[in-house]
Design a protein with these regions (language model features):
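N-terminal helix-turn-helix DNA-binding core of bacterial DNA-binding proteins
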Residues: 45, 49-94
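Extended, non-catalytic scaffold segments that flank or surround catalytic motifs
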Residues: 34-52, 80, 106-112, 120, ...
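A cross-family signal for key residues in well-ordered alpha-helices
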Residues: 68-71, 86, 133, 159, ...
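N-terminal leader segment of winged-helix/HTH proteins
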Residues: 1-58
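Charged, amphipathic alpha-helical coiled-coil/dimerization segments
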Residues: 100-160
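N-terminal positioning helix adjacent to the helix-turn-helix/winged-helix DNA-binding module
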Residues: 32, 36, 62-66, 127, ...
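Alpha-helical linker/hinge and terminal dimerization helices associated
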Residues: 40-43, 47, 54, 88, ...
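DNA-binding alpha-helical recognition surfaces that contact promoter or target DNA
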Residues: 97
Length: 172
């Protein structure tokens, strides 16, 4: 039986039978894409931790997940909970819990949709608007700092590439 030498990721030389080589090559197919997806997840977690630290340091009294809801409403109010859940990538049960907590804090309210009584539309309250005015400049500092360090050109390139990845994944 003829044997092949293959390099593993750790650069140690291993000897494999020909049928094993095919299996190893097949296992490695897609490894770069898998690593890319892991890095996207790690980056999101680093972003979450950074925002959590910023919120805590400024005594915001909300979680990153609550911030996601509020941030979405800062861009558009009067949207259904279903649309809001899709925009922040949360399931309905999780969003309901977040909404309950934000209502208790007085930052949001839900109103019946006049076109469909089964749906609730979500709005910021005056307290939610006031909170936005207080916390948004602090959050913007995080974005400005990161943008300054990374560079606009690099960010534009990464954004374009990630949009391509998104388009591919949506088609699969």
């Amino acid at each position: 039986m003829k044997l092949f030498k293959c390099l593993t990721n750790s650069t140690k030389i291993r000897i494999f039978a020909p049928e094993k080589v095919k299996t190893i090559i097949k296992m490695r197919e897609g490894a770069e894409f898998r690593e890319l997806m892991l890095q996207v997840v790690r980056t999101r977690m680093a972003f979450r931790r950074s925002m959590q630290r910023t919120l805590k340091k400024n005594n915001a009294g909300i979680t990153f997940e609550m911030l996601q809801v509020l941030s979405s409403l800062w861009h558009e109010q009067g949207i259904s909970q279903q649309i809001l859940a899709e925009r922040i990538a949360k399931d309905k049960a999780c969003l309901t819990n977040l909404m309950n907590n934000l209502e208790k804090k007085g930052y949001v309210c839900r109103k019946e949709d006049p076109n469909d009584r089964r749906n609730k539309l979500v709005f910021l309250t005056p307290a939610g608007e006031e909170f936005k005015e207080q916390i948004r400049p602090v959050l913007d500092q995080v974005y400005v700092y990161a943008e300054h360090i990374i560079g606009i050109e690099s960010i534009e390139t990464m954004l374009s590439e990630l949009n391509s990845v998104y388009d591919v994944l949506e088609k699969i």
